[in-house]
Design a protein with these regions (language model features):
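Short glycine-/small-residue-rich Rossmann-like dinucleotide-binding loops
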Residues: 12, 31-32, 116
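Short FAD-binding loop at a beta-strand-to-alpha-helix junction that anchors the flavin cofactor
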Residues: 111, 168-200
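A short, glycine/Asx- and small/polar-enriched loop/turn
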Residues: 1-6, 106, 161-163
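Flavin (FAD/FMN) cofactor-binding core of flavoprotein oxidoreductases
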Residues: 132-175
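Active-site-proximal substrate-binding core of FAD-dependent oxidoreductases
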Residues: 202-204
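Central helical "cap/lid" subdomain
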Residues: 16-79, 144-146
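Active-site substrate-recognition segment that forms the wall
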Residues: 64-72, 76-123, 129, 133-142
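Conserved beta-strand-loop-beta-strand element in the redox core of flavoprotein oxidoreductases
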Residues: 1-21
Length: 204
């Protein structure tokens, strides 16, 4: 063990333990709620944990569907001719055709994100129930009523920041621990990039 240096303890799925040592700093680039829980479970940098209390985030149920049977001669897509749209449907806020993106396999695939309000209201619902409701809503939004070959849902508890930290990062030089994420400045990928860059510059 090296005095003043960080150690990382890992636990594998088969129960094996490893210790990695000699790190100058720890940077937590995770949701604010998870970072807060980690900091509160230790006595390191209590001031950083206190700064996270103001951050708020909304959940999101996300539906992913695939239609491999669309890949056949004379049929390139199913459903609408647009590739992405915001929605005013009470369940779904955003839909995107993943297979339209550059470099993607030619298998008709869509992602649909439920609205923050609906996701919050149904946060404790069983995934199968959520999937059935979102499939129905997806068909109503897109007009695509063919049964998908694959469908699954994923729940993100901290998907979209509703009240950001208001600064690009948090960094405690004495403890050697820093925090950053999109939740520092907003909820977009650009916010995550800027937060990470600013933290890296502070550490350097």
């Amino acid at each position: 063990m090296q005095p003043g240096r960080w150690q990382l303890h890992t636990l594998s799925q088969d129960g094996g333990r490893q210790v990695h040592a000699g790190f100058d700093a720890v940077l937590l680039l995770i949701p604010a709620a998870q970072a807060s829980a980690l900091l509160q479970a230790s006595d390191v940098a209590p001031g950083l944990a206190a700064g996270l209390h103001a951050v708020e985030a909304a959940p999101c149920w996300t539906l992913m569907v695939a239609y491999p049977h669309a890949v056949q001669p004379g049929l390139t897509t199913l459903g609408p001719q647009w590739n992405a749209a915001r929605s005013t449907h009470h369940r779904i806020a955003w839909v995107a055709r993943e297979s339209s993106k550059p470099g993607r396999a030619p298998v008709e695939r869509w992602t649909a994100q439920a609205s923050p309000a609906w996701s919050s209201e149904h946060r404790n619902d069983a995934p199968a129930r959520v999937q059935a409701k979102l499939l129905k809503a997806f068909a109503e939004v897109t007009g695509l009523r063919a049964a998908p070959v694959h469908a699954e849902v994923l729940y993100w508890p901290d998907a979209q920041t509703t009240r950001p930290l208001g600064r690009s990062h948090l960094w405690d030089a004495a403890a050697g621990i820093g925090l950053a994420g999109d939740w520092c400045l907003g909820h977009r990928v650009e916010d995550a990039f800027v937060a990470g860059l600013e933290l890296a510059l502070a550490v350097a």
